[in-house]
């Protein structure tokens, strides 16, 4: 471009008229729509109006002002559109903003806030109790789970006579917990205050957040739960018909709903996780704004869900966030979590290029991943066979809710017909990615799965990461698959799995967006939460403003001038679900007894006693299980019986109480067995009486009845 000289500019310059000074309308661009545009592009173009709401800083003492910036790309001449049209999203957000709680202190300035924070910090270091007003009632946050483990997510917020609960999940039992299915939160504290419960907020539908509801809701008289449609469906499937009829619920819309629960006002916003309809809560309370950031990842291109509501997050971040509670699962891992869209593209390319039968193993609860797999399978004309009940139930629920929209004949439970179709038309989606005993893939790897057998031409795709602690069963399963000569694809070959939890850079992004005064690393093992704490310190949150409860039950207290991790704790027990039974760990000897039997076996001895003479009237009978190898049984059994007979005959004139005699025989027998085999099994000496009712000798025991009802404590298992 040639710039004019000074003289040229002077000669050409004319003073513009007043009329020409008026703002001119921006010319409209005429965009010709390509005739060959893809359906994806067309669907994007249908949404022709963008709206960017924001909150302006308000003058001191004034309420915050709202404005909407709308950019219209639609055809001006089209009826009902153009510059005079009002964007529906703008209306919704305007209505939403009008219903929101106002800022806690709309007139506070940045300088005043910083000065207040520095004053509080100076006093707090010396003696934080000076910051607490006399007779001030704090808002109490009580974690019933999630502070010592990944699981049992359940947190209470309590202020005076109002309580809200966030989630109620489980933790699966460890191998050492013989016979236990899973553990649930101890709600003894809540049962005493169930009239104060204003509602239960559900973040998403994973088992570690909802599966305990079927146990605790009846005990709490079925308080209202606030839940998304998918989470509600998963909750209903976990409950029996009777409890389903009593279930009280409200389906919430994160884009529009604001809940009033006692003194708490709750805003809801969308986040991304590996299950659709995940939510966070911004809780306005008498002690400030609390943001609860349970399971999440920052995914700008999610596969099947809407992106996280960054607009609402940033707007809330402009307010004074008193406390931010953020999950810690991936806090020790650097970087960002990979987008589910990338995982979906990689899976799609594998399915497209593979001409063999494909078996994919993933979590049944990873509904987003399962939906991507089904879409790709149908795209390449593969029939999807589902293996295992949890996988079948979850897919059926997603079909009912409209998340999965494929021809019904393309999805079916696995059966004999799977062997009758061409390999290139088959995909099997199954459980077992963690090597769980009796899971579908584990049974397939050992050729014990009904109606289906793996062959050397199959491809097994492991779309998951190994959870810490599951390494051994996963390796065993992979070894079995290798023996079957199948091809294995896992995350080491290609990105076929992404965690549903944010990593370090995701956590930093949330801290920068919300700018909390106090921070509480939650949900994870101790090392995870400490890694989260280090991130908070790197983001300029001072150490004394980071709340780190050491264990479940330790209380976080919010006062007007300070937030503290209190020394106060509520006593919590480990509540275990064992089949249809529910029992507490403390005071129970079941787990110890199961451990002894699992490690060392069990030996039972039956003494038949004449109650008049106290003499043995028959040979001592002995039975054992898991005790010694078959070639040793006869020899060791004989030694034990002879020792037991000698001890009984030597003591029979002395004992007055049968329980004392049982304890003495058990103790001496244990020492003897330890000498001959080097370990002590569970020993169960039992007496059977003949000739006389022994009432008065051993209590109310009927004739010819063995003492089988003695507790483990009475048998000496109380050490």
What residue ranges belong to the model's regions?
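His/Asp/Glu-rich metal-coordinating catalytic cores
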Residues: 103-201, 206-420, 439-453, 472-474
């Amino acid at each position: 471009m040639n710039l004019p000289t000074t003289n040229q500019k002077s000669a050409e310059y004319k003073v513009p008229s007043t009329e020409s000074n008026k703002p001119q309308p921006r010319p409209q661009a005429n965009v010709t729509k390509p005739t060959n545009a893809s359906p994806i592009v067309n669907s994007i173009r249908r949404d022709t109006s963008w709206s960017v709401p924001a909150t302006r800083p308000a003058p001191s003492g004034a309420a915050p002002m709202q404005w909407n910036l709308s950019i219209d790309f639609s055809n001006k001449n089209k009826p009902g559109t153009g510059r005079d049209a009002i964007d529906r999203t703008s209306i919704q957000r305007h209505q939403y903003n009008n219903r929101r709680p106002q800022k806690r202190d709309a007139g506070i300035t940045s300088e005043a806030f910083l000065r207040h924070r520095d004053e509080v910090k100076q006093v707090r270091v010396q003696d934080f109790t000076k910051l607490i007003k006399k007779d001030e009632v704090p808002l109490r946050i009580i974690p019933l789970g999630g502070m010592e483990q990944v699981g049992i997510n359940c947190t209470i917020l309590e202020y005076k006579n109002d309580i809200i609960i966030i989630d109620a999940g489980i933790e699966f039992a460890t191998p050492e917990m013989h016979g236990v299915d899973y553990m649930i939160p101890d709600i003894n504290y809540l049962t005493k205050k169930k009239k104060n419960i204003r509602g239960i907020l559900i973040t998403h539908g994973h088992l570690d957040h909802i599966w305990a509801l079927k146990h605790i809701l009846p005990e709490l008289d079925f308080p209202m739960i606030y839940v998304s449609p998918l989470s509600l469906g998963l909750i209903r499937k976990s409950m029996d018909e009777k409890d389903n009829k009593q279930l009280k619920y409200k389906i919430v819309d994160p884009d529009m709903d604001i809940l009033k629960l006692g003194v708490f006002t709750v805003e809801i916003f969308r986040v991304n996780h590996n299950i659709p309809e995940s939510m966070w809560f911004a809780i306005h309370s008498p002690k400030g704004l609390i943001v609860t950031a349970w399971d999440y990842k920052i995914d700008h291109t999610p596969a099947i869900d809407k992106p996280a509501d960054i607009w609402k997050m940033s707007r809330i971040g402009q307010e004074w966030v008193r406390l931010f509670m953020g999950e810690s699962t991936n806090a020790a891992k650097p970087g960002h979590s990979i987008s589910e869209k990338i995982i979906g593209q990689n899976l799609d390319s594998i399915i497209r290029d593979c001409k063999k039968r494909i078996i994919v193993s993933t979590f049944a609860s990873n509904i987003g991943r399962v939906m991507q797999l089904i879409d790709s399978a149908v795209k390449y004309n593969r029939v999807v066979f589902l293996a295992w009940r949890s996988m079948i139930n979850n897919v059926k629920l997603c079909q009912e809710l409209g998340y999965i929209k494929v021809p019904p004949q393309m999805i079916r439970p696995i059966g004999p017909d799977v062997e009758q179709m061409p390999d290139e038309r088959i995909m099997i989606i199954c459980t077992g990615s963690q090597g769980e005993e009796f899971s579908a893939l584990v049974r397939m790897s050992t050729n014990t799965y009904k109606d289906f057998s793996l062959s050397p031409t199959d491809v097994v795709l492991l779309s998951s990461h190994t959870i810490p602690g599951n390494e051994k069963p996963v390796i065993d399963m992979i070894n079995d698959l290798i023996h079957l000569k199948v091809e294995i694809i896992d995350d080491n070959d290609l990105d076929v799995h992404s965690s549903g939890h944010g990593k370090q850079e995701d956590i930093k992004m949330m801290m920068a967006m919300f700018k909390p005064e106090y921070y509480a690393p939650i949900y994870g093992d101790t090392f995870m939460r400490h890694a989260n704490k280090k991130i908070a310190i790197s983001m300029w949150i001072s150490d004394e403003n980071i709340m780190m409860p050491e264990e479940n039950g330790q209380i976080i207290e919010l006062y007007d001038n300070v937030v503290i991790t209190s020394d106060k704790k509520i006593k919590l027990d480990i509540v275990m679900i064992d089949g249809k039974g529910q029992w507490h760990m403390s005071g129970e000897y079941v787990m110890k007894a199961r451990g002894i039997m699992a490690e060392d076996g069990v030996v039972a001895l039956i003494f038949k006693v004449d109650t008049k003479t106290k003499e043995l009237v028959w040979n001592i009978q002995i039975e054992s299980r898991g005790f010694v190898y078959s070639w040793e049984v006869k020899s060791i059994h004989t030694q034990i019986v002879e020792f037991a007979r000698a001890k009984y005959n030597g003591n029979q004139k002395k004992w007055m109480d049968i329980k004392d005699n049982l304890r003495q025989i058990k103790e001496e027998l244990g020492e003897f067995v330890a000498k001959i085999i080097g370990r002590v099994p569970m020993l169960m000496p039992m007496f059977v009486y003949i000739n006389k009712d022994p009432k008065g000798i051993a209590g109310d025991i009927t004739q010819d009845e063995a003492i089988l009802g003695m507790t483990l404590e009475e048998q000496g298992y109380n050490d």
